[in-house]
Each structure stands twice: as C-alpha cells, then as structure tokens.
Amino acid sequence: MLSPKRVKFRKMFKGRMTGLAHRGSDVSFGTYGLQALEPGWVTSRQIEACRVAMTRHIKRGGKVWIRIFPDKPITKKPAETRMGKGKGSPELWVAVVKPGRVMFEIEGVSKELAETAMSLAAAKLGVKTKFVAREEAVTHEG
C-alpha cells in the first residue's frame, strides 16, 4: 500500500474539495487514462486494488502508471469512545481527487483492452470516472 515515508505533521485538517484539477488533467505518460469526474478521497487500498486489477487484466503487455499518491492522513477515534479528548489517531491515507484529474494511465495495449482494464479499475473507486485517450483528454483551464 502507498503511504508517505515521512510527514511534517501526523494529523491534517479535513479540508474542502472545491474546484477543478488544474494540474494532472492531461494524459502525459501513457496512451489512455482514467479521469475523475467528481471530487472525492481515494484510499491507498483502492489505488492498490485498481493497480492489481489492471495489471492482471493486461497480463504481460503494456505499462500502468499511477498518477495519484495518498498523502493525506485520515484519523479515526476508537469504537464506543465518548466525544472530546482530542483528535483520533491516523488510520489510513487518502489521495484528494478533484474533477478532471487523470488517476491512472496505460500504454502498450489496444484501446479495447485498455478500456476494459480501466472499467475494472473504475469499479474499485468511489468516484465517477471516464476513459480518455491522449488526444481527447480535456483540460479544465480558463
């Protein structure tokens, strides 16, 4: 599972997911990509499940890039604990995804195979996505 090696602070504010992704909205490494259509948190477990699903489906051919990294710690208080007494301990790591962000990319496989691999990955995510090719990836600037 992906997680940062070191962090400056153990706990982070919840934050707000407003606006569109200005960076990382183009397919830049591979030929095909999976682009987010809505904001959300993608956990390190979800990212790993997507990676495994895609690499198993494309077998030996092709290369997969993961364009997001879970760098935000999410805290959780123990079960049946009264409110107060401070913030809970870090439980999991998430990547904050905004609409337009390309999360995964594939190269070296046919369009049909890439599309089915991306749909397998999309089923593991908690955000709506769409399949994009390098030439038709939409940038949200302006």
Curated annotation (Swiss-Prot):
Lineage: Bacteria, Pseudomonadati, Gemmatimonadota, Gemmatimonadia, Gemmatimonadales
Identification of the protein by name: Large ribosomal subunit protein uL16
Entries under NCBIfam families matching the protein: rplP_bact
Subunit structure: Part of the 50S ribosomal subunit.
Record HAMAP family: Ribosomal_uL16 (MF_01342)
Record key words, sorted: Ribonucleoprotein, Ribosomal protein, RNA-binding, rRNA-binding, tRNA-binding
A Pfam short name: Ribosomal_L16
Record-linked CDD domains: Ribosomal_L16_L10e
GO molecular function, one term: rRNA binding
